[in-house]
From Swiss-Prot:
Protein name: Phosphoglucosamine mutase
InterPro entries: A-D-PHexomutase_a/b/a-I (IPR005844), A-D-PHexomutase_a/b/a-I/II/III (IPR016055), A-D-PHexomutase_a/b/a-II (IPR005845), A-D-PHexomutase_a/b/a-III (IPR005846), A-D-PHexomutase_C (IPR005843), A-D-PHexomutase_C_sf (IPR036900), A-D-PHexomutase_CS (IPR016066), Alpha-D-phosphohexomutase_SF (IPR005841)
EC number: 5.4.2.10
Family: Belongs to the phosphohexose mutase family.
Sequence positions bearing Phosphoserine: 102
GO terms, biological process: carbohydrate metabolic process; peptidoglycan biosynthetic process; UDP-N-acetylglucosamine biosynthetic process
GO cellular component: cytosol
Modification note: Activated by phosphorylation.
Keywords of the record: Isomerase, Magnesium, Metal-binding, Phosphoprotein
Cofactor(s) essential for the protein: Mg(2+)
Isomerase found in the keyword field: yes
Organism from which the protein derives: Shewanella putrefaciens (strain CN-32 / ATCC BAA-453)
Highest taxon of source: Bacteria
Amino acid sequence: MKERKFFGTDGIRGKVGSGQMTPELALKLGWAAGRVLSRSGTKKVIIGKDTRISGYMFESALEAGLSAAGLNVMLMGPMPTPAVAYLTRTFRAEAGVVISASHNPYYDNGIKFFSTDGSKLDDNLELEIEAELEKPLVCVESHLLGKVSRIEDARGRYIEYCKGNFPAEHTLTGLKIVVDCAHGATYHIAPAVFRELGAEVIAIGDKPNGMNINDKVGATSMGKICETVLAESADLGIALDGDGDRIMMVNSKGEVIDGDQILYILACDAKSRGVLRGGVVGTLMSNLGLDLALQALDIPFARSKVGDRYVMELLKELDWRIGGENSGHILNLDHGTTGDGIIAGILVLAAMRRQNATLEELTSAMEMLPQVLVNVRFEGEHDPLKSDKVKVAQAQVESQLGVRGRVLLRKSGTEPLIRVMVEGDDHSAVLAHANLIADAVKSAS
């Protein structure tokens, strides 16, 4: 396949005003996408965004470009990424566009596309769009220009969709939940969803100002929600990231429940109800504790490369339904086409209600093994992972760890780094093993 110039594994992303993330590119991208998408279908595109101040600028630019190509545009305003995927399906739009840089700081932004079925846009279509980007922008004639409208009830539609994933015979009455919206796209959605299901909700990170998204709040910064759960004597906490496709949780003791533990809860619940299809997909970074806990229940476990895109690919290949990353990207293909933090939280709460159990009880049988990650910088073209010294060190550590440990060495995709990850039963031993391999990598660099 031809190498892509603009689209990465998750659309286009970067610092606003530099590189690719400029209003000029957004305008041209809208036009190029419009040219490709207008060849078939409804000629209707939905645009959603998170709460970054630059979102308005990119929304206007994309809107103008799509209209110039003859496509009608439906604006949603600030809405979670999975909401854009859902409403793209329900409106039978030709595509959905999300303006977001997910968990990145406010000064970054990004643009990615969903296909008409709410899944990632096909690679070949992205290549076609890139080919159109190389051409001069030519506006269609005035009577063919696209029209722009706003989906006034987008929020209500998505709230009802989320609530529909919670079993009708249960409520959240009696639960006190802290919900951290990361000052992002879920700020006006998530608290309402859990309140309407009956919970007492304490919302934090729900006051976006365009420049505070993901700033010391949300799924990538868990300190505040842990403190709030303890201070409010809450039953649990739910932390989402800036665009709402990622979730981390907190139990009543203020302990973080990560994506691996959430996957365990969902798999156990599905198996107990006889609806688990196949097994669970994690990644190379998933904790060995998840693997061992699922083994004990005879639930198959497979690892993909790091990235929710690769989790999705392996789920489809195996025809399984549940997968995700320890960072909180959770996929359940019985409940959506993309990662959805709110719905993942709803499914965990449903498991709690069905089993009349606390979050602590649902995770008690899964032992998270100590995991140490050491980054080693290297110079030049030489690959340290091919060194005999590194291979010997890795083999030595793996022999000492046995079946209750794991070693993973991989190159960073963005920096000249070798990532050394070691897991095992004893933290001090794991740390020593990781440093032993890291020293071998350094000497081979």
